[in-house]
């Protein structure tokens, strides 16, 4: 049994403009070098762009996109015998949301058409993810496929 103290759960404040905790988490994720004003500007403009494109509430679109991209299993490497094997592990909701947000940003950064700003690429990736398409959805499906392929190894305890 470990004697190390458990880390405290981070409590995020709600975003001042949209009054939403998920938007605040996304802003903190996109922020670089402590420049939160720029991160807010990018997120707010992409939310306005989403609203113009879909004619719907952008918060609902973002929540739908994050829930579509959120995985429920993760692959962890574990050394068994002399070889390293990939073991699927169920993950909690916080970890799933963190992975979903990370994958959305990676997909928008890697998106072709670098001539468009990050705002356009991010908003299009969020709209695609809310419709069940896009690179982030492919990443989630790939993770689930790997977990399905390695489900015979679940008998070993990872944690």
Curated annotation (Swiss-Prot):
One of its GO terms (molecular function) is rRNA binding. It is found in: Plastid, Chloroplast. SUPFAM superfamilies: Ribosomal protein S7 (SSF47973). Pfam families: Ribosomal_S7 (PF00177). One of the primary rRNA binding proteins, it binds directly to 16S rRNA where it nucleates assembly of the head domain of the 30S subunit. Part of the 30S ribosomal subunit. This is Small ribosomal subunit protein uS7c. It comes from Bigelowiella natans.
């Amino acid at each position: 049994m470990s004697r190390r103290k458990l880390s405290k759960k981070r409590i995020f404040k709600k975003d001042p403009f949209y009054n939403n905790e998920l938007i605040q988490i996304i802003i903190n994720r996109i922020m670089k070098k402590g420049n939160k004003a720029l991160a807010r500007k990018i997120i707010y403009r992409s939310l306005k762009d989403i609203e113009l494109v879909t004619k719907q509430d952008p918060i609902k679109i973002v929540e739908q996109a994050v829930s579509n991209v959120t995985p429920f299993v993760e692959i962890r490497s574990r050394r068994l015998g002399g070889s390293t094997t990939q073991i699927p592990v169920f993950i909690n909701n916080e970890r799933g949301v963190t992975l979903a947000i990370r994958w959305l940003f990676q997909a928008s950064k890697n998106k072709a058409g670098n001539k468009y700003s990050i705002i356009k690429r991010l908003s299009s990736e969020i709209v695609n993810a809310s419709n069940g398409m896009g690179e982030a959805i492919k990443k989630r499906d790939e993770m689930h496929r790997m977990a399905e392929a390695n489900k015979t190894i679940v008998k070993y305890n990872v944690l």
